[in-house]
Swiss-Prot record:
NDH shuttles electrons from NAD(P)H:plastoquinone, via FMN and iron-sulfur (Fe-S) centers, to quinones in the photosynthetic chain and possibly in a chloroplast respiratory chain. The immediate electron acceptor for the enzyme in this species is believed to be plastoquinone. Couples the redox reaction to proton translocation, and thus conserves the redox energy in a proton gradient. This is NAD(P)H-quinone oxidoreductase subunit I, chloroplastic. Belongs to the complex I 23 kDa subunit family. InterPro entries: 4Fe4S_Fe-S-bd, 4Fe4S_Fe_S_CS, NADH_quinone_OxRdtase_chainI, NDHI. [4Fe-4S] cluster 2 binds at C71, C101, C104, C107. Coiled coil: none annotated. [4Fe-4S] cluster 1 binds at C61, C64, C67, C111. The keyword Transcription does not apply. It is an enzyme of class 7 (translocase).
Amino acid sequence: MFTGVQNYTQEVIKAAKYIGQGFTITLDHMNRLPVTIQYPYEKLIPSERFRGRIHFEFDKCIACEVCVRVCPINLPVVDWEFQKSIKKKQLKSYSIDFGVCIFCGNCVEYCPTNCLSMTEEYELSVYDRHELNYDHIALGRLPISSIKDPMVYGVNGLSYLEKNIIQDNTNKDTVTGPYNKE
């Protein structure tokens, strides 16, 4: 009987220890300062491995369709034709519908020629969902980096950024907007 009570007590202590570990994480998050940004005028700089809009380089693509096979929803549409003279596939068009894309990054990870990459662009809002279907021309445009964008104010004090990485972009000569009218 004594061993049964002892085992029960050990299990209770172990359970309390697990609950305490989770509670310390909760308390740690409660002690952090809020990270609220005024979105149109301040933009959050995404983390290093952020998975945003996909960038496509037409010249590198060999039309192997690996991206279609690894996509959980078979999303990329690859249109190609076989060139008998050079005995290779010739890519005609490539498109991705970002209204359906889940931004898992499998297509980027498994692409053998690295013609796909994830950008830091996260502003994909449109009024018509059909505008989210990007062809190879729209996918080839690189977005403006949010660090180099003059409309972006630096958001300092983020926990995942090292000190002095973000420079304050509030130069009065370059920033224009509704609040800087003279």
